[in-house]
Swiss-Prot record:
This is 3-dehydroquinate dehydratase 2. It comes from Corynebacterium efficiens (strain DSM 44549 / YS-314 / AJ 12310 / JCM 11189 / NBRC 100395). It is an enzyme of class 4 (lyase). CDD domains: DHQase_II. The active site is at Y22, H101. GO terms for molecular function: 3-dehydroquinate dehydratase activity. InterPro entries: DHquinase_II, DHquinase_II_CS, DHquinase_II_sf. It catalyses: 3-dehydroquinate = 3-dehydroshikimate + H2O. SUPFAM superfamilies: Type II 3-dehydroquinate dehydratase (SSF52304). The keyword Repeat does not apply. The keyword Amino-acid biosynthesis applies. Belongs to the type-II 3-dehydroquinase family.
Length: 145
């Protein structure tokens, strides 16, 4: 099994941008944590982060072509991107995806409570900090067994 972990806009700024909301853990820290957990689970994992919608869509298409499940933190595209949802629909029809948010998006500004992706996701993890990525990985690994 192989899982693609996708991080959307501004997540390259983890540890620097709004640490009171997102904490001090960097994206490199998150990727290392997930890679360690994936290794322990016997799961292959790869990562992409982009601030550009088209690059994320291309990554989703690549995952679909390989039959990989996806863990995605779409950042601000959660609330705005029909195109990303359309790409993820192919994953939803196949291996499936889990939507992850570091902060509790439902406890923040009202516009953050709406997700174009949640209705087609296997599940949504929000507000559990960076641990949400590991929980998503564990869920996907358990699902394969």
């Amino acid at each position: 099994m192989h899982v693609l972990v996708i991080n959307g806009p501004n997540l390259n700024r983890l540890g620097k941008r709004q640490p009171e909301v997102y904490g001090s853990t960097t994206l490199a820290d998150v990727e290392a944590m997930v890679a360690r957990r994936a290794d322990a689970l016997g799961v292959g994992v790869s990562f992409i982060q982009s601030n550009h919608e088209g690059e994320l869509i291309d990554a989703v298409h690549n995952a679909a072509d390989h039959g990989w499940p996806v863990i995605i933190n779409p950042g601000g595209f959660t609330h705005t991107s029909v195109a990303l949802r359309d790409a993820l629909a192919e994953i939803a029809d196949g291996a499936g995806f889990v939507e992850v948010h570091i902060s509790n998006v439902h406890a923040r500004e009202p516009f953050r409570a709406h997700s174009y992706l949640s209705p087609i996701a296997l599940g949504v993890i929000a507000g559990l900090g960076v641990r949400g990525y590991e929980l998503a990985l564990e869920f996907l690994a358990d699902r394969e067994r």
